[in-house]
Amino acid sequence: MKSSGKPLAAPKVGMVSLGCPKALVDSEQIITQLRAEGYEISGTYDGADLVVVNTCGFIDEAVQESLDAIGEALAENGKVIVTGCLGAKKSASGSGLIAEVHPKVLAVTGPHAVGEVMQAVHSHLPKPHDPFVDLVPAAGIKLTPRHYAYLKISEGCNHRCSFCIIPSMRGELVSRPVAEVMLEAENLFKSGVKELLVISQDTSAYGVDVKYRTGFWNGRPLKTRMTELVGALGELAAQYGAWVRLHYVYPYPHVDEIIPMMAQGPLKGHVLPYLDVPFQHAHPEVLKRMKRPANAERVLERVQKWREICPDLTIRSTFIAGFPGETDAQFETLLDFIREAELDRVGCFAYSPVEGASANALDGALPDDVREARRARFMEVAEEVSAARIARKVGKTLKVLIDEVNAEGGIGRTAADAPEIDGVVYVEPAAKASKRYKVGEFVSVKITGADGHDLWGEV
């Protein structure tokens, strides 16, 4: 059979990605597989033959946002496959929530289900056949800017926090093989990534499910454990002049082993002095009802010890105010903890019942206005603490990774600032050509000003 000479148009798939960075990585993996098989990615509904919507189902607002996004995709395109956490959520009747609200979707899967998503895509939009073209770089397709990327090291969680339903949606902890993680990290650095953000549901638990099994990387043994993984990632980052940033670090004892890497030796400046630790509360009774580790005094001692070892350490955390049964005195204990721990970056949610969470059955539910008032008061205190710590940086010269360049100068981040969630540095335009900077470059910036959240500086 003779060829017509015209290449067949590749089928196009649209992608809508909602939720946390872990869901973003799932979306990246789906897009990578689509491109590997020859599909094109469409940035518009009307330019796509089919749309995949990756959902979030953690809190009620996220559920509604996901349902709205599915509805919009159905209205604008008509052919929709749904994946993500909301896909695992049941309705009050016990059936799948998405199928009940949007019965016209083509298929529904749960989270981290690339294979199932691809099967659904194949069923409704057969893949093209072009074995002569490799469309995908080794680093995969990323939705983040080229100079930073998320590295997911595990999926699922073994905790059973009373306010959370993530384990019921994402399952028990499953750690990725250490060699697979290291290979992905190496490919990302080779592709030009300057900042690697390590994520999971519980980074500290990496390897627990496989009893810290020893794997191999570049011919040498490497234990499937957070400490050893961070050390290896730091060594790799040093080869490429890059950063490694740790997120979702539960305060297990072996976290203490990471702090010296941040403070001294060859990994200093590559394993960033930054910990994202979800403390959630500080009063032992509230923590007990949350089914969280309940030794707040010990946590405070450890935070202070970490800072003795690594004075530049930045600690980010999240908290819940107005949890069922929280008394005025218990809330004041939380505020005292924030002041004493001097946390750098803090987020706080007013407690909100989540369908399926065991906390819904607890006594002592607080009125909406009390919960919101406590959240607002918490943030007032947290912002005072944060502003005081940020002000200490004025006059210092800091290493900044440039995220954006425009007519007014540049916008970048220091080691203390993760993308999207922390502050930024507004950098004045370079006065000399020799000092001009580009996106993805590290520059030395003298800090000239600060507000409660961001910094200003000049090269």
Swiss-Prot record:
Q: Where is the TRAM domain?
A: 391-459
Q: Which PROSITE patterns does the entry link to?
A: MTTASE_N, MTTASE_RADICAL, RADICAL_SAM, TRAM
Q: Is the keyword Iron-sulfur assigned to this protein?
A: yes
Q: What is its EC number?
A: 2.8.4.4
**Listed cofactors:** [4Fe-4S] cluster
Residues that bind [4Fe-4S] cluster 1: C20, C56, C85
User: GO molecular function terms here?
Assistant: 4 iron, 4 sulfur cluster binding; aspartic acid methylthiotransferase activity; metal ion binding; protein methylthiotransferase activity
Spell out the subcellular localization from the entry.
Cytoplasm
- Every copy of the Radical SAM core domain together lies at 143-388
Q: Where is the signal peptide?
A: none
GO cellular component assignments = cytosol
User: Which catalysed reactions does the entry list for this protein?
Assistant: L-aspartate(89)-[ribosomal protein uS12]-hydrogen + (sulfur carrier)-SH + AH2 + 2 S-adenosyl-L-methionine = 3-methylsulfanyl-L-aspartate(89)-[ribosomal protein uS12]-hydrogen + (sulfur carrier)-H + 5'-deoxyadenosine + L-methionine + A + S-adenosyl-L-homocysteine + 2 H(+)
The cofactor binding remark recorded in the entry reads: Binds 2 [4Fe-4S] clusters. One cluster is coordinated with 3 cysteines and an exchangeable S-adenosyl-L-methionine.
Q: Which residues belong to any copy of the MTTase N-terminal domain? A: 11-126
Q: Which CDD domains match?
A: Radical_SAM
Tell me the Gene3D superfamilies matching this sequence: Methylthiotransferase, N-terminal domain, Nucleic acid-binding proteins, tm_1862 like domain
Keyword vocabulary terms for this entry: 4Fe-4S, Cytoplasm, Iron, Iron-sulfur, Metal-binding, S-adenosyl-L-methionine, Transferase
- Judging by the UniProt lineage, the source's domain of life is Bacteria
GO annotation, biological process: tRNA modification
Instruction: Give residues annotated as binding [4Fe-4S] cluster 2.
Output: C157, C161, C164
Q: Which InterPro entries match?
A: Elp3/MiaA/NifB-like_rSAM, Methylthiotransferase, Methylthiotransferase_CS, Methylthiotransferase_N, Methylthiotransferase_N_sf, NA-bd_OB-fold, Ribosomal_uS12_MeSTrfase_RimO, rSAM
Q: Which family does it belong to?
A: Belongs to the methylthiotransferase family. RimO subfamily.
Q: Which HAMAP family match?
A: MTTase_RimO (MF_01865)
Q: What does this protein do?
A: Catalyzes the methylthiolation of an aspartic acid residue of ribosomal protein uS12.
Sorted alphabetically, which PANTHER family does this protein's record hold?
RIBOSOMAL PROTEIN S12 METHYLTHIOTRANSFERASE RIMO, RIBOSOMAL PROTEIN US12 METHYLTHIOTRANSFERASE RIMO
The protein here is known as: Ribosomal protein uS12 methylthiotransferase RimO
